[in-house]
């Protein structure tokens, strides 16, 4: 029997949860706690404020802030107002933030104190923003607390639709421009029973859920939504700080958390790891990038809890496959697999000519399910290319073994995953090519013990021009987010290309992956 009712909208499920768990703790951050009843009341205030600012259902509301209970309030407020939350990646550079805010046509922008200088420097470039609200004190912008004080806490009582957009998360594109993936009530509610049958099967109103993944990321968004739906106590930290994470696992008796492999590695290497009591942990859900077998086995030994691997994309609501704890036994030979499809998810492997591959043959991974996004925001051509007959083309290449377990082999679209962040070569190459002395450039992902992969650039300079590796890296950091920037640069005379001019990334990548067994980390 399901732990929550089947409804048409996420709002209806939330409203049911608020009544079921009214006096239970919904959130804890530092020493502050908030009940589900208070969470519901504050979301009413946010929703009413959104309307008073002239926004309407389907308006986009952007947030550039680190994790906080205020962020969670805004998320619920957008749900109550039938507006759409646009979580901004706070690692983006100024021009990238401008693009996403304008592309999404966001009408309100909530900004955390860490990002005041950034927004001050670019606010004149916003085309649709009616108001900027400071999530703290600011000389010019109205503060979040002051803004909220003007509105009542009456329930807007809007009835949403199953096909309403709920969140719009931006994922980088092969053209170098991010695309907004539109996730609806239908998508999110399709994923909840899948979670309930797998890594959420033991979640309940007494569970302590750790919200440490950024809320602009599909993993962070999913974890907080599921934590609320299941009625957990959700412990929030601004960002994944290893010292704080280990401390809170002890003091808050954390039971479940999602972590990217790089964070797991940081925790294992932290000097406080050996003194941390992990006995409260029931499970770690991990994904967003590959993990080495050595790291995984050490983590299982040190933390002593169940491990669930998940594979999914922003466009699939973070849902695709999961590798259950019983298959984390090295003797079963599945540790390098990302698992089996959730119930309600169809996966096929397709060759370049469109035919379905035989077992063991590598092809593009395609997914069909109600979790597939409605589409990219105002990207008709990209939608036509990425979703055909309800099948989503992931751009990842993989194969099924004889037991139906999916193995990721390579990336059709050349995407690099570094520390759980998706990086597209085109974005980095566009930034490099803006340098006046660079006449050609290509980037690939190469192995990195800490991040899984890291960006390596190959650059051809104009004749008689000289620059150091440090010069190029420094320049790229002025153009794009630092996590996308090259960590190493090779200067070469010619970038290898095929007759049609396409960069031969495999030629550049191959020497670095020869000993790794597969061509992604």
Feature names for model-found ranges:
Residues 2, 6, 23-68, 72-76, ...:
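Conserved AMP-binding/adenylate-forming core of the ANL superfamily
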Residues 22-23, 152-170, 177, 201-208:
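Conserved pre-ATP/AMP-binding loop-to-beta segment of ANL
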Residues 35-38, 166-193:
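Conserved AMP-binding A3 loop
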Residues 71, 92, 98, 109-111, ...:
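AMP-binding/adenylate-forming catalytic core of the ANL superfamily
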Residues 116-162, 177, 270:
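ANL superfamily adenylate-forming
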Residues 189-208, 216-255, 270:
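Conserved AMP-binding/adenylation subdomain of ANL enzymes
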Residues 229, 254-259, 268-332, 346:
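Gly/Ser/Thr-rich phosphate-binding loop
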Residues 340-344, 353-385, 421-423:
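Conserved ATP/PPi-binding loop(s) of AMP-dependent carboxylate-activating enzymes
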